[in-house]
Amino acid sequence: QYLFLLFALIVLTGCGGTQKKLTEYVNPFLGTATMWEPEDLGYTRKIKSRTWGAETYPGATLPNAMVQLSPVTQFRSGAGYQYEDTVIYGFSHTAKGHWNLLHVPMLPVVGTIAPGNYCSGFSHEKESAHPGYYQVYLERYKVNAELTSTLRCAYHKYTFGKGDDKSLLVDIRRSNNDVRDWKIEKVDDNTFTGYQDGDGKIYFYAKTNYKIGQVEMVKDDKHEVAVLRFIDSKGVEPLEVKAGFSFVSIENAQMNLKAEMLNKSFAQVAEEADAAWEALLSKIQVAGGTEREKRLFYSTFFHAFKWPALRSDVNHEYTDVRGEVVNNGFHYYTDPSFWDDYRNK
C-alpha cells in the first residue's frame, strides 16, 4: 500500500512538468514591422514612403541598459531595424525608437571591401532572437552572427566558413546622427579602442580573440570605413569581440568591460542576460488568458523596459547635460520621453 502511494505521488509530481520560463513568451520582433494598412494606421496613406511602426528592435540588451546590440537594416530610421528590409549594414551598440543613436556599427566581412556597398542580405528563416540574445546568418559573407550583452558591454560571436579570411568592418563614420569626429586605433595585439561623436560622444574599448594585424581605413568615392585585419585569420575558432562602452572615457569603457564581461564566455553572458529578463518579467505573474495573450503581454512588458537607458559607468561617473563628468554615487539614466513609455503601442 505504501509503495503504491509513493509511486502515485511520483507520477503526479512528474505530471506537473517544468513550468515554462517567462522569457519564452517574449517575441523580440514584435513591433519591428512598419504599419501599412489603413485599419492599422487610422488613415489612408497618400505617399509611398514608410509610415509609422512601433519602432522596436530585436537585438540583445538588458533592462534599461547602456548597450543595445542590434542589427541595422537602415540608417536614418527609427530603431535601425525594419522587419521588411532585406539587408544588414552592421550591428550597432545603442538604439531606441527614435532617429538617433546606432553607435559604432560593426560587421564581420570576408574579402575585398567596397565602403559604399558592403551590406549583407539575410532572411528571417535564418534569424532568431530571445531576451538578451540575437542571431542571424549573413548571406553575403557566409557568417553566422550571434550577439549578447551586459549592461555596458557587447559580445559579438561570428562563425565564418571554413578557411575564410576573417575581417571586422567598423563603420566608424556612420550612425543615425551626423558623425562630427571619430577615432579608432589598435592598442595592442588583441585590443582596439576609439570613440564616435555624433549626438554625444561614446567611447569604446574592445578585445578580440584573434590577434589584430592592422586597422585599415578603406575609402572609395562614396564612403570610408575601418577594417580590422587579423593575424592567422583563417583559424577555425569563431571571431569573438568583447566591447565595453562609456559616455565618459576610454578608460571607463575598459573598466566597464573588466567588471562585466572580460573573463566570461559567450554562453555565460547569454545565460545571465536571460536570467536578468526572467527576474524582471517574474515581477508580474499572469493567470488565465490564452497563450497568444501571454505572448503579447510579456513581449510588450519586455519592450517597455528597454528605455530609459543607463548612462553611468560602474564607478558611477557620467557626463551630464553640460558636458561635465559627474559622480553622485548613483545610477544615472537618460530622460524618459512620455510618448516612449509604452513603445510597443
Description of each model-found segment:
Residues T13-G14:
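C-terminal motif of bacterial Sec signal peptides marking the signal peptidase cleavage site
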Residues T18-R343:
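Accessory carbohydrate-recognition regions in carbohydrate-active enzymes
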Residues Q1-L6:
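Sec-dependent signal peptide recognition
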